[in-house]
Design a protein with these regions (language model features):
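A short, conserved structural fragment
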Residues: 114, 124-139
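Mid-protein regulatory/catalytic core that forms ligand/cofactor-binding pockets
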Residues: 179-255
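Short, cationic-aromatic polyanion-contact patches
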Residues: 80-91, 104, 134-166
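Short alpha-helical "recognition helix" segments of helix-turn-helix
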Residues: 22-29, 34-35, 49, 104-112
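Short, leucine-enriched amphipathic alpha-helices that occur as contiguous helical runs
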Residues: 1-12, 54, 84-91
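Short, amphipathic alpha-helical interaction segments positioned at domain boundaries
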Residues: 143-188, 204-206
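Short, amphipathic alpha-helical "recognition" segments used to contact nucleic acids or chromatin
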Residues: 12-18, 87-100
């Protein structure tokens, strides 16, 4: 398996999620009190500096290190798009004549920044591994979401370990992504970002799962959620990983 195969699988999973209207379930899980309690260490009485206007901010102490938790609210997950992006300019998606066209080599190539031959080869590898099949009713490619989640939870951080770099402008990822309702970052403001000239934040450069990820997520809101959560799993410890897996599971329509 190659990293572009993982990108393709999550893109196709995002198409399934859009068909099944799963965005609300993912947002509900990310906003749940259970998740908030899992993420919340012992609170200390300290007024944090910084933060954006209108953003709830609290500082906690965990293992001797300050951690800043941000809570962001999205009132209209399906209809309102302000605030979910981590970049400064919108990127138009290619127009499609029908829903099934989104699964075509042409559409997947345009949305992911891969050539048609790369998409075809990637799909062949995914079919061989059992991660991609054909839907019985529609005949369209269908992701084995449960197995993809297992691989993401237990294997991706070892197959594709995180490579961090210098401070750069970029697109927030992990729990720092604005597509999520909460984020964790150090008190010094060092958040993980995918390097990108249009990024809205400065943070520590994190090499994306595949080089075209920063452009691909600008065209697909749910894909941004998915890949930010994948990075939270790759970057985080057992607790953060558990939270991210729970949100991702809900967003993929799994029980």
């Amino acid at each position: 398996m190659k990293s572009q195969d993982v990108l393709l699988l999550f893109k196709m999973a995002s198409l399934h999620a859009q068909e099944e209207n799963l965005f609300g379930k993912m947002e509900s899980e990310s906003n749940s009190n259970r998740v908030e309690e899992l993420l919340k260490p012992q609170q200390i009485n300290r007024m944090p500096a910084g933060g954006r206007v209108g953003e709830s901010l609290a500082t906690y102490l965990t293992g001797g290190e300050d951690v800043v938790f941000h809570r962001r609210e999205f009132d209209s997950p399906l209809g309102e798009e302000d605030g979910w992006e981590g970049w400064s300019e919108s990127v138009p998606s290619a127009s499609l004549t029908g829903w099934s066209e989104a699964y075509s080599l042409r559409a997947l190539s345009a949305s992911l920044g891969l050539s048609k031959s790369e998409i075809s080869n990637s799909m062949a590898r995914c079919r061989e591994s059992g991660l991609l099949t054909n839907d019985y009713d529609t005949g369209l490619a269908k992701v084995n979401r449960r197995e993809l989640l297992k691989i993401t939870e237990h294997a991706l951080k070892y197959f594709f370990p995180v490579k961090s770099g210098a401070m750069v402008r970029g697109i927030p990822t992990g729990f720092a992504a604005p597509a999520l309702s909460k984020s964790i970052k150090s008190a010094g403001g060092l958040i993980p970002v995918w390097p990108d000239a249009l990024g809205t934040e400065r943070g520590q450069a994190i090499e994306p799962l595949y080089k075209t990820v920063p452009e691909a997520v600008k065209k697909d809101r749910i894909l941004y959620h998915y890949l930010a959560l994948v990075d939270a799993i790759r970057l985080g410890g057992p607790r953060e990983c558990g939270v991210a897996v729970g949100i991702l599971k809900a967003g993929m329509g799994l029980k």
